[in-house]
Amino acid sequence: MEEVAWMYEQDPARMKPISETKGEFVSPISEQLLKDIWEYIQDGNNMVGDTLPWESDFRFKPKTLNVWAGINAHGKSVALQQCALHWAVQGKKTAIWSQEMPCETVYANLIRQATAVPKPTEMFHALVAAWLNNWVMVWHQPSMRFEDVFTFLDAAKKENIDHVIIDNLTSIGLTSDNLWMHQRELIVHLKKACMELGLVIHVVHHVRKLDSEKNQPDKFDVVGSGDITNLADNVFIVNRNVEKQEKMADGWGSQTISSSDTRTWSELSDGLKSAVKVRYGQPCRIKLWWNQIGPDTGAFTDGQHAPSTVYFKPPEDMEYDQEVPF
């Protein structure tokens, strides 16, 4: 108590009466909290929360901050947009802000992913857009400052959003005199927003320039302050298989990889999504392939011959002027 009294004398602005704080003891354990604890114990760490679009025990816990990092153009945004569609099917709403893509590009990607059709007809894409209106909202703001991020989050909360995608951290206008300090401050406030607003927040970020684009980055390659990964609940690395892409382009798809590896280049995955930090659970690696329609739809499957996932199915009596995967 003497130490607390001393702190109050030194800096009274930082020491507030209990009545003015938001903190409180949760003891004795309430009936609702007891129920929540029981469900958590029964389900285990991995079974609480929203799933990924691909086969995995990983779950996005409520009120968590997630960082999605990787080399530029390796599929971070593609994977997250596909997640938004997957969550929509689960009855969860997502808000997206993208500095690198205009709104029409984000929606075009979502429509192609949702249908697994590279170029849907005008009627078809209008139906998908109407469905998206209920589940995925895109925030239009050409430039985002520190304080604008939280205006966006507050607006998302008012729209009953469950997941928020911020694409990307580098595009947010932070004061450059001490960029790492301001990045840390932003991550701290994002983590606080997760808890206070009940949101699951996903932040896209870059990794440092590696010796080769074929190298697999890890969490220590994430650009900027180490607190970005330290404070995040989960950190994902999305990496494209550039070597396979080059071999396939050169016509080596049917060739074996080496004398010790008898797989062919075409058998390798097109990409890899690695959970390199998981606060509640175990790290995991998910091999990804472009779906049967190909990269034009910007959607992944978790098996070489896995069927394309169709998130939106139109009326059965609708006519098509092209082949569709359902």
Where are the regions that the model predicts?
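Conserved inter-motif catalytic segment of the P-loop NTP-binding fold
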Residues: 6, 31, 90-178, 185, ...
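Catalytic acidic motif of RecA-like/P-loop NTPases
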Residues: 170, 191, 208
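Charged helix-capping and loop-helix junction motifs
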Residues: 180-189, 218-222
